[in-house]
Amino acid sequence: MSNTKQAPKVGFVSLGCPKNLVDSERILTQLRTEGYDVVPSYDDAELVVVNTCGFIDSAVQESLEAIGEALAENGKVIVTGCLGAKENQIREIHPKVLEITGPHAYEEVLGHVHKYVAKPTHNPFTSLVPAHGVKLTPRHYAYLKISEGCNHRCTFCIIPSMRGDLVSRPIGEVLAEAKRLKEAGVKEILVISQDTSAYGVDVKHRTGFYDGMPVKTSMVALCEELAKLDIWVRLHYVYPYPHVDDVIPLMRDGKVLPYLDIPLQHASPRILKLMKRPGTVERTLERIQKWREICPEITLRSTFIVGFPGETEEEFQMLLDFIDKAELDRVGCFKYSPVEGAKANELPDPVPEDVQEERFQRFMELQQQVSIRKLARKVGKEMTVLIDEVDEEGATGRSFADAPEIDGLVYLNGETDLKPGDLVKVRIDEADEYDLWASLIG
């Protein structure tokens, strides 16, 4: 008879954005390091941790439903994440939740787990936890979170109230993590935060150290260092500060991917002012033109809100005109939705839901035509593709122009001998409004 005691099982549910995913990875890594068996289900788990999202109402609802399901299936639930910042709201609906913490409260979550499920005395997983930690993404790409919180006070957003003001991670720590990811076989690093271009602002861009060398705590210096890893580096959530212009030459020179995820939100000066967002249409179009002159290959992704309180038909038309002129490559659009605690809720003249929907459809139809034009220009061109999946029908991957989950795909029909993480040269054969079809070269 074996005396080996089975490791205690902890169920884990991760909801929300990539930034929340990174928080989940950190908690999971520590749980595994301490000897807990983390399982993706409620079966036999001694308790369940739910990492929630609370950014928009639909995310709040999804989080509350996940908590309810975990309570029904297991009974012992610890809640963390963005919705955890609203403890009263959770307890009103789910009073039986054991403990609640806000976002990035790693030590508190672990302390709560220890309280209800004793830390194992023997850890069978010590040698199984990789140096780069537990990852929830495929092995060939990973998110690298460089900061927490945000100093902006956009009226439609409640992130600062949940995650606090900007706190930049030490640059040496960030670069050391990036190196571990590369050594683990990661081919693409996706740099994320609430506000990537503000990296280092809170510490006045002080000089840090990595490998004994001084490195400035700034987005540009970070990009220059990450480039030395010789893997794909993709920038997300880049607030349109003037110094973003300094990253474009690095893209031209192949140091980071020529891809910029830069949320612009609207084109009307009055609506932008109500949102507390920067920029004017003329200046933004000038910058886009300049970026394309410096780096003709650059892919621009952005997000916009239609139906913001007070938005007139004329102001919406300004947004459509901007979309037509800017010819952005990838665009996300959201209908304004009141978020509990957002300042924009107090603004007059809410836009009726049917008008929001009609504007959303017009916006997406126009952007679809822009996307069709842009992708059609890629037919016949050669490019490098990172393979994500392979099945009996062939391989699916992404070019530098496509971030995982949110952008388009490149299909390689019949190519069943490839494997995820392969970087291959292809020629583009066909395109539709979102995706490409290609053939291997050679």
UniProtKB/Swiss-Prot annotation:
GO terms for molecular function: 4 iron, 4 sulfur cluster binding; aspartic acid methylthiotransferase activity; metal ion binding; protein methylthiotransferase activity. It comes from the Bacteria. Its main location: cytoplasm. It is found in: Cytoplasm. Keywords: 4Fe-4S, Cytoplasm, Iron, Iron-sulfur, Metal-binding, S-adenosyl-L-methionine, Transferase. Residues 8-118 form the MTTase N-terminal domain. This is Ribosomal protein uS12 methylthiotransferase RimO. It comes from Aeromonas salmonicida (strain A449). The lineage of its organism: Bacteria, Pseudomonadati, Pseudomonadota, Gammaproteobacteria, Aeromonadales.
